[in-house]
Regions:
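Conserved active-site segments centered on acidic
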Residues: 26-78
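Terminal amphipathic helices with adjacent charged low-complexity linkers/tails
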Residues: 40, 94-101
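Phosphate-handling DNA/RNA-contact segment within nucleic-acid enzymes
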Residues: 47-64, 103-227
C-alpha cells in the first residue's frame, strides 16, 4: 500500500501493524485468521487463547453486560454519582476503558449469561462465578454491587475484571482469580489503551491502581499502566 498524501507505505503486515496498533506476531495472527490459515507453532506449545475461545467470548459478553447495567439498571445512578462526582470521570473516558456496573444481587450475571450448564462451567473457570460450598454444582456471582474494570490483554481481549466497592465494604477492590487466560504477574492494566494512543511506547508510567490509570488518561497522560 502507499498513501500519496503522507507518503506512508508498506505491505499487508505493516499495514495491519499500523492500523490496528499490533506487533509483528499479532499482525501475522490476524492476517492468518482472516485468510483461514493456521500459523505454524512449535509442537507442544498451543496458543492458550485459541484453546480458550469460548471462555474469552463469555468474558467479552460479561464486559458488555456490565456496561449495559451502567446505562440501564434501576440503580445505575449511584454508579454514575461515584464515577462522575466522586472521581470526576467523564462518560467518554468511562467508555474508553469499558467501565461497567455489577448490580446488587447474587445471580444477575448468572441469570443473564449462565443458563446452560456448560456456560456456567466456563464462567466458573473464568472467575466470574463462585461455587457454593454447601451446594456443589450451584453458583453465585463473584462481582456484586461494584464498579467494574475490564482487564484487557495487549490485543484488547477481556481476560479478567477488577471490581470496586462503593462504600467501606471489604475488600474495597475484588479481582478475578488467575485463570487459563489471566496470570496477574504477566499483565499490565491499561497497556492496551495506552497502545491505542502510542503504538510504540518508549516508556510507561507505573501507577498503583485502575483508577490512577484512568484519571491520568483523562488528563492527557496516556502512557500509564497498573500492575
Amino acid at each position: 500500500y502507499y498513501c500519496f498524501g503522507c507518503g506512508a507505505g508498506g505491505n499487508a503486515i505493516s499495514f495491519v501493524m499500523e492500523h490496528d496498533h499490533l506487533d509483528f506476531v499479532e499482525a501475522i495472527e490476524v492476517l492468518a485468521r482472516d485468510a483461514a490459515m493456521e500459523v505454524p507453532r512449535e509442537q507442544g506449545a498451543p496458543d492458550r487463547y485459541e484453546q480458550n475461545a469460548a471462555l474469552l467470548k463469555l468474558l467479552s459478553e460479561s464486559a458488555t453486560y456490565f456496561q449495559q447495567q451502567l446505562i440501564s439498571h434501576p440503580q445505575q445512578a449511584k454508579a454514575h454519582t461515584y464515577l462522575a462526582n466522586d472521581r470526576g470521570l467523564s462518560g467518554q473516558i468511562a467508555k474508553v476503558f469499558g467501565l461497567g456496573f455489577a448490580p446488587p444481587g447474587w445471580d444477575n450475571l448468572l441469570k443473564s449469561l449462565g443458563q446452560r450448564a456448560e456456560t456456567q462451567e466456563q464462567l466458573l473457570l473464568g472467575g466470574m462465578l463462585v461455587e457454593k460450598q454447601e451446594q456443589p454444582g450451584h453458583f453465585y456471582d463473584r462481582f456484586r454491587d461494584r464498579i467494574m474494570f475490564p482487564i484487557r490483554d495487549p490485543r484488547g481481549r477481556v481476560i479478567a475484571f477488577g471490581g470496586r466497592a462503593f462504600g467501606d465494604e471489604k475488600p474495597k477492590y475484588l479481582n478475578s482469580p488467575e485463570t487459563a487466560v489471566f496470570q496477574k504477574s504477566q499483565e499490565l492494566y491499561g497497556l492496551y489503551e495506552a497502545k491505542q494512543n502510542t503504538p510504540v511506547l518508549d516508556h510507561i508510567i507505573i501507577v498503583e491502581g485502575y483508577m490512577d490509570v484512568i484519571v491520568l488518561a483523562q488528563h492527557g497522560v496516556t502512557n500509564s499502566v497498573a500492575t
